[in-house]
Every structure is written in structure tokens, then in C-alpha cells.
């Protein structure tokens, strides 16, 4: 993902000062769904709410940024209505639903094609009768975002439907659709025929247990790369192990290493530049920042802090701060060098448990 570009000053005498000033201006823009009818637009550098995006329906929840980074697709809390937000105007430009009459259709997962002309939806259908509801699905549907019509119903890969945890993703060029199951199955994005398979259900190397990788790219991962924690079982000692893996999905490559026995870590955030990362240790009454040296392939520190029951983690665009958030109406700001709490940023409303979209760069219109 791109970083905020630095301004090159023409005057040589101001070069050092200019470089320092440019670094100080590094920021990112957060789009935070809330338990209201707004998505809050928050600027990292000023730590201020700079705008609000008024949705057509209450409680925006699940969000997804498109490949061009100029639209957010927003699923409201009931899962029945998808709204499309134009980030240039910060306004809702479209919406659709599959519900009609006594039939409610809830979207449990979705992936939008990079062209923004179609999406893949995982849905369930609930039909209200006189004395009962009839539940059907889950189904995988191709939906034309321009014609607002279902254009195809896909067979589940391997013939196994998944009530929970179905995950699809398009490649950046839109030619391949990845389905994440026991294996990673690559489908032609137009014909939906299988063209490749990464058999993660089998050990990557002899004597290793099956790995469980995170395949979701972080804010500061390189394009086409996802770095995250993974867990696997040592088949000889029969113990769970924890490690870090860097996965290049298109090349079916995973560079991984173990750190030690599995621990209750949640959240994993790579810092800008890709040399450091952080995670959160969370046990009853015990919370810690874990600091990782990705270049040295090691954990370099555990730092206790007050913590909170539900936590997400994000690194600032300049790498100097750590943000702890999720649930409630606050973001706790920590120094990434000392791990001391600097301050708590408060909002007028609670944020939902849906994902926050973070885009490096200043908020512009």
C-alpha cells in the first residue's frame, strides 16, 4: 500500500528541514463505522474528526475498500442492504438489496471485482410464513452492480457449502477469484472453473503440522503480500506453535518461521516499511504489546499495558504510535518506542465491531 509522498524542496539549504517536516506530516485517514447513521472520517495527524459520511440506513457495519481505493462498500447491521460510498465526494452513490416482501436475504460475505461492475455474495434466504421461517442456503451468487441483478449462482468449490467462514477474494487484476477453505482454490473469475490449488491442508514441509495462515493483507503490507501470525501443531511433541508468515498468494509462496509455543495473541499490525510489527497479548487480567523484528525474524519485547476486553491494533503512518481500538467510543494512543499511553481520543458515538478502513495519506475531497 502506498505511503504519503514526501515533497522535495528545491532549495538545498532547506532540504534537511524539509525532509523532517514532510515526515511529520505523514498521516492516514480512517473510515470508522458507528452505531449511528454515520461513518466517521478521522485524521491521524490531527487526531480530529474531519468529516462524517451520512448513510441512508442506520448502523453501517462491515466495510470493504475497492481496488481503486475510491469507494467503500458498506453492509448495514442486518446484512440486507449494501451501500456504496464515493470517497471523493464522501457520499452514498448507490445501494442494493436482495430482500423483497416476506423474503429477507442476508449477506454473510462479499467480494467486489476490481472493475466495480460485479460482486460475489454469500447469502442466506429467510422466508416468513404464517407460523415459521424457512431458511435456505448459504448460496454463492454473482451480482451485477450496474444492472442490480443476480446473474449467476455458483457451485460451492469442492461441493462443500460453508455456513460460516466462507471467504472469497479477487486478484488485483480481476482475472482470478480465490476461495479460502481447507485449501486455497484459484478460480477463473469469468468461468469459475478451477485453474489452480494451493494445498494448505497438507504440511508445507515433511514433519510439520498443517499451518493456519492469515491471508488478509494489512494496511502497510506490500501489494500482493500478507504478513501475519500463524499457528501450527508440532506432530512430534503434539503442541501448538506460533510463528510469523509472509504469504504471496499469486506465487503460492509462504516464508514462515516459528517463535515458540502458541500464545493468546490477537491483532497483528505491520509498521510502515515492513521491518517491524506488533501484536496484542490478551489473557484474563493480563495485556501486553508484543514487538517483532521482522527483518531479524524474532520477537524483541513484551510490554504490559492496561488493555481492554476487545481490542484491535493499528500502527500510525509514521510508525511512531500504536492505536488500540474496537468497540466503545475511544482510541487509545500509545508511543511505539516506550509503549506508554499518550492519550485517549473520544468520539460522540460507539464504533461497531465491523472493520475500520485505513487509507494512508491525508483526507482530501
Features from the language model and the residues they span:
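Short loop/turn segments that connect beta-strands within beta-propeller blades
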Residues: 44-47, 86-90, 144-148, 189-193, ...
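Blade-loop segments of beta-propeller domains
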Residues: 52-112
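A short beta-strand motif characteristic of beta-propeller blades
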Residues: 48-54, 91-100, 149-159, 193-208, ...
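Structural motif
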Residues: 38-40, 80-84, 129-141, 183-189, ...
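Blade-level signature of beta-propeller repeat domains, shared across WD40, Kelch, NHL, RCC1
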Residues: 325-365
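Repeated scaffold domains used in trafficking and secretory/extracellular systems
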Residues: 58-66, 103-112, 161-170, 204-221, ...
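Short, conserved, GDST-rich strand-edge loop motifs in beta-rich repeat architectures
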Residues: 25, 121-137, 223-239, 281
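Short coil/turn segments that connect the beta-strands within blades of beta-propeller domains
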Residues: 27-29, 68-70, 115-118, 173-175, ...
Amino acid at each position: 500500500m502506498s505511503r504519503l509522498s514526501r515533497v522535495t524542496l528545491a532549495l538545498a539549504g532547506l532540504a534537511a528541514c524539509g525532509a523532517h517536516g514532510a515526515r511529520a506530516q505523514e498521516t492516514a485517514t480512517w473510515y470508522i463505522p458507528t452505531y449511528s447513521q454515520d461513518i466517521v472520517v478521522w485524521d491521524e495527524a490531527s487526531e480530529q474528526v474531519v468529516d462524517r459520511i451520512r448513510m441512508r440506513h442506520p448502523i453501517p457495519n462491515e466495510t470493504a475498500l475497492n481496488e481503486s481505493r475510491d469507494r467503500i462498500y458498506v453492509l448495514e447491521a442486518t446484512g440486507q442492504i449494501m451501500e456504496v460510498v464515493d470517497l471523493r465526494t464522501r457520499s452514498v452513490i448507490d445501494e442494493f438489496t436482495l430482500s423483497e416482501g416476506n423474503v429477507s436475504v442476508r449477506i454473510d460475505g462479499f467480494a467486489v471485482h476490481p472493475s466495480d461492475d460485479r460482486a460475489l455474495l454469500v447469502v442466506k434466504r429467510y422466508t416468513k410464513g404464517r407460523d415459521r421461517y424457512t431458511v435456505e442456503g448459504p448460496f454463492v451468487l454473482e451480482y451485477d452492480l450496474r444492472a442490480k441483478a443476480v446473474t449467476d449462482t455458483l457451485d460451492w468449490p469442492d461441493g462443500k457449502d460453508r455456513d460460516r467462514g466462507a471467504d472469497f477474494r479477487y486478484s488485483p487484476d480481476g482475472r482470478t477469484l480465490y476461495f479460502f477453505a481447507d485449501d486455497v482454490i484459484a478460480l477463473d473469475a469469468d468461468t469459475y472453473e478451477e485453474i489452480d490449488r494451493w494445498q494448505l491442508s497438507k504440511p508445507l514441509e515433511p514433519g510439520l503440522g498443517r499451518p493456519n495462515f492469515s491471508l488478509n493483507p494489512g494496511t502497510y503490507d506490500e501489494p500482493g503480500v500478507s504478513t501475519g501470525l500463524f499457528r501450527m501443531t508440532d506432530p512430534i511433541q503434539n503442541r501448538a506453535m506460533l510463528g510469523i508468515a509472509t504469504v504471496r498468494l499469486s506465487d503460492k509462496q509462504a516464508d514462515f518461521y516459528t517463535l515458540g509455543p502458541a500464545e493468546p495473541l490477537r491483532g497483528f499490525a505491520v509498521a510502515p516499511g515492513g521491518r517491524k510489527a506488533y501484536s496484542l497479548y490478551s489473557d484474563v487480567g493480563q495485556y501486553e504489546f508484543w514487538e517483532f523484528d521482522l527483518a531479524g525474524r524474532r520477537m524483541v519485547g513484551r510490554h504490559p499495558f492496561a488493555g481492554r476486553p476487545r481490542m484491535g491494533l493499528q500502527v500510525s503512518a509514521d510508525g511512531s504510535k500504536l492505536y488500540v481500538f474496537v468497540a466503545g467510543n475511544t482510541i487509545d494512543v500509545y508511543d511505539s518506542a516506550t509503549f506508554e499511553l499518550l492519550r485517549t481520543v473520544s468520539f460522540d458515538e460507539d464504533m461497531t465491531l465491523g472493520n475500520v478502513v485505513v487509507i494512508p495519506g491525508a483526507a482530501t475531497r
